[in-house]
């Protein structure tokens, strides 16, 4: 990792994820010792996307480490919508399953939105069902979208006061940008969502006390776009080809350039990525507790 000046503190998502997973592991062990079953997470994967396969394996390993049961469902790339809908319906009824996740992206012939809508909202481990998003809009309790919730947990861990701060979110996806804007609003930030059609983007980002990049463009945010002393959160994960069969992971922020300007900065890897997986597990345990009334 690039050397970071003393004026910039790294927001260490990997360390917090390990801490939170340790707490979940102890929680689960205690509940199982009391005679309860282990929490169960079902992950549905369609096709053989290499990146998706890695993500699924990581989630299954994390489940095993925490004492959770993983119900992996792997379907061929030509599986039709009806088969997947039936599989989700079966998992909705399965009392061993507390969380259901459909690994994205799906093959083009499948309607991901319709599939996500068929998941029982109480088992929506990813927090993307319209019912759970509706709870977020209304400020009610519910399962939260994993990546935005991971961002908020990381900011909270460092006791960063968000009240009254100007927050700019780059990206308006339903996965990150929109729910994160709502979560920042809950913490009394003044929130701006910027996107590909935003004019005078750098003028807007330079007003941000908190700048979140979630657009999937490698090292898009440069030092001249950042307000001195800002909190910068990099949600992007982009693989850059270095040639000769080598590659590296970078975020949406030019880490080396922005570190001397920001007061807090998340690294890639080791920032928001580990938090996303951890919040997925936390959602599953929360669903498990609710379903068992414990």
Swiss-Prot record:
It holds the Pfam family THF_DHG_CYH. NADP(+) binds at residues 171-173, 196, 237. Its EC number is 1.5.1.5, 3.5.4.9. Keywords: Amino-acid biosynthesis, Histidine biosynthesis, Hydrolase, Methionine biosynthesis, Multifunctional enzyme, NADP, One-carbon metabolism, Oxidoreductase, Purine biosynthesis. The keyword rRNA processing does not apply. GO terms for molecular function: methenyltetrahydrofolate cyclohydrolase activity; methylenetetrahydrofolate dehydrogenase (NADP+) activity. Pathway: One-carbon metabolism; tetrahydrofolate interconversion. GO terms for biological process: L-histidine biosynthetic process; methionine biosynthetic process; purine nucleotide biosynthetic process; tetrahydrofolate interconversion. One of its GO terms (cellular component) is cytosol. It catalyses: (6R)-5,10-methylene-5,6,7,8-tetrahydrofolate + NADP(+) = (6R)-5,10-methenyltetrahydrofolate + NADPH; (6R)-5,10-methenyltetrahydrofolate + H2O = (6R)-10-formyltetrahydrofolate + H(+). Homodimer. HAMAP family: THF_DHG_CYH. Catalyzes the oxidation of 5,10-methylenetetrahydrofolate to 5,10-methenyltetrahydrofolate and then the hydrolysis of 5,10-methenyltetrahydrofolate to 10-formyltetrahydrofolate. Belongs to the tetrahydrofolate dehydrogenase/cyclohydrolase family. This is Bifunctional protein FolD.
């Amino acid at each position: 990792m690039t050397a970071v000046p003393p004026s910039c503190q790294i927001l260490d998502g990997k360390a917090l994820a390990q801490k939170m997973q340790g707490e979940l592991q102890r929680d689960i062990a205690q509940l199982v010792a009391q005679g309860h079953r282990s929490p169960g997470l079902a992950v549905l994967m369609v096709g053989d996307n290499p990146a998706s396969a890695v993500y699924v394996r990581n989630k299954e390993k994390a489940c095993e480490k925490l004492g959770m049961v993983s119900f992996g469902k792997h379907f061929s790339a030509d599986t039709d919508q009806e088969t997947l809908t039936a599989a989700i319906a079966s998992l909705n009824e399965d009392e061993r399953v507390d969380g259901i996740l459909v690994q994205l992206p799906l093959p083009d012939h499948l309607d991901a939105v319709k599939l996500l809508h068929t998941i029982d909202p109480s088992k929506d481990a990813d927090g993307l069902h319209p019912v759970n998003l509706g709870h977020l809009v209304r400020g009610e309790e519910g399962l939260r979208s994993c990546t935005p919730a991971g961002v908020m947990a990381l900011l909270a861990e460092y006791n960063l006061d968000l009240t009254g701060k100007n927050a700019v979110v780059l990206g308006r996806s339903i996965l990150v940008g929109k729910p994160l804007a709502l979560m920042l609003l809950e913490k009394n930030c003044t929130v701006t969502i910027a996107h590909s059609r935003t004019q005078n983007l750098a003028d807007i980002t330079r007003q941000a006390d908190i700048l979140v990049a979630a657009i999937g463009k490698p090292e898009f945010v440069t030092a001249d776009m950042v307000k001195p002393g800002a909190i910068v959160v990099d949600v992007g994960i982009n693989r850059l080809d270095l040639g000769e069969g080598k590659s590296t992971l970078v975020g949406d922020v030019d880490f080396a350039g922005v570190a001397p300007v920001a007061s807090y900065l998340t690294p890639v890897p080791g920032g928001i990525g580990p938090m996303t997986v951890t919040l997925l597990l936390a959602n599953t345990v929360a669903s498990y507790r609710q379903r068992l009334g414990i």
